[in-house]
Amino acid sequence: MEDIVIVGRHAVKEAIISGHAINKILIQDGIKKQQINDILKNAKSQKLIVQTVPKSKLDFLANAPHQGVAALVAPYEYANFDEFLQKQKKKARYSTVIILDGLEDPHNLGSILRTADASGVDAVIIPKRRSVALTQTVAKASTGAIQHVPVIRVTNLSKTIDELKDNGFWIAGTEANNATDYRDLQADMSLGIVIGSEGQGMSRLVSDKCDFHIKIPMVGHVNSLNASVAASLMMYEVYRKRHQLEEKS
């Protein structure tokens, strides 16, 4: 398989720190070394190959703003679902997974991974068919979070939901109608939160598998939110419920 190109100083730094298999670091000719000192220091400590290249080569490889640095990395590996379940059984806290039903926009997936990392989500689950995969665009949009959040790719989303439920998870599906306000979501349980596709929402089969449905109230003129925005609201509502503010003295 071909290398994936990661671009941008923060994303490259996170890739190095995470220990992902990096084949080569590419640095733009003429860039000031103090601007990428952390990258060079970490690359040296891991004995990575660092090559200086013309800006034109980075422009060609990245096809996006690259800040003068790129990393050629091995394709991202997906986490194993069974191994994930075993790890969750050993945890002394409730778990949270985000289940993406047919999400196709790589920028949305990258943004969801970024918020998932920030809010302590344990994994993101995507189906193999009719869904975005882990790509260079996803990596860039995640600003490094792709290195820290397990992404599980499954053949049958409906069956996976059944297995989650068998292992103590409650499944909450996001719907626009006939659903409970998401602010009433109970978080004292392990949760799987389903986010539907940008255009169609959840599939009927997946919706029927949900234990309950939640909605985000809207009082404006639009009737839906971007998938990554909706997911972010859900993730931080769970975080808020589980991490109460300490009373100020």
From Swiss-Prot:
S-adenosyl-L-methionine binds at residues 196, 216, 225. One of its GO terms (molecular function) is RNA binding. One of its GO terms (cellular component) is cytosol. Keywords: Methyltransferase, Transferase. It comes from the Bacteria. GO terms for biological process: methylation; RNA processing. Disulfide bonds: none annotated. Its EC number is 2.1.1.-. SMART domains: SpoU_sub_bind. It holds the Pfam family SpoU_sub_bind. It is an enzyme of class 2 (transferase). InterPro entries: Alpha/beta_knot_MTases, Ribosomal_eL30-like_sf, rRNA_MeTrfase_TrmH, SpoU_MeTrfase, SpoU_subst-bd, tRNA_m1G_MTases_N. Belongs to the class IV-like SAM-binding methyltransferase superfamily. RNA methyltransferase TrmH family. This is Putative TrmH family tRNA/rRNA methyltransferase. It comes from Staphylococcus epidermidis (strain ATCC 35984 / DSM 28319 / BCRC 17069 / CCUG 31568 / BM 3577 / RP62A). The lineage of its organism: Bacteria, Bacillati, Bacillota, Bacilli, Bacillales.
